[in-house]
Amino acid sequence: EGTAAGLADVRAQLTAAGTPDAPVHILFATHSIPTRDAEAAGRSEGEPREFEEGSAYVAQHLATGAAVISRVEAESGLTAPWSLVYQSRSGAPHVPWLEPDINDAIADLAGQGIKGIVIVPLGFVSDHMEVVWDLDTEALETCRSLGLAATRVPTPGAHRKFVNGLVDLISERTSANNISDRPAMTGLGPWYDVCRPGCCANFRGGKPTIAGADSTVGTGHDAYPAGSAGAAGGEGTL
């Protein structure tokens, strides 16, 4: 709903400006993380899947973005090209993080002749400071400075459908249904409830990795021996 409404809003802005058929691009935004962490995400022993761009973190966002676009096209008939971008980079400048930064992407798209931008905060569920500052302030200001029509789609927050979805996830995990019976919105299939042993490696020595059954404090090693009930974990839905 939000993405379709955002597309309609940008189209209305362009129509008011006398350019109703000008090209529009959708940017799905999520929090950037260090490239090394992204490449290690999901790389647990025995994981059968090959992740797009070599990262479970990136693959999940790309799959979710594709699912959103498919739903928008089916329900509203609206369509536009889209891409995944990143925000909120921090840390040492010499450490590579996932790119492109949303502001760089907006500038590149403007140079390609794009006239409208729809920003979808795909990686966020509420309007906290990083959404309000990085998107509503910086990204939309970049759009204004380049003369682009733009809007930022709201996060789900306490939207009824989002809350109902959370209830469904809880119900799945408290039911006796087989994991394989859980529905999934993307080709990645049902996801794990907690990180599998060896997943999401901790590259920062001496700092704990807290991820369910994944590791002991400060070592980055498995908290449960392979094959144990604790190591097995469950699977969830993404």
Residue ranges and their predicted role:
Residues E1-L238:
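Extended amphipathic ligand-handling, pore-lining, and cofactor/metal-binding catalytic surfaces
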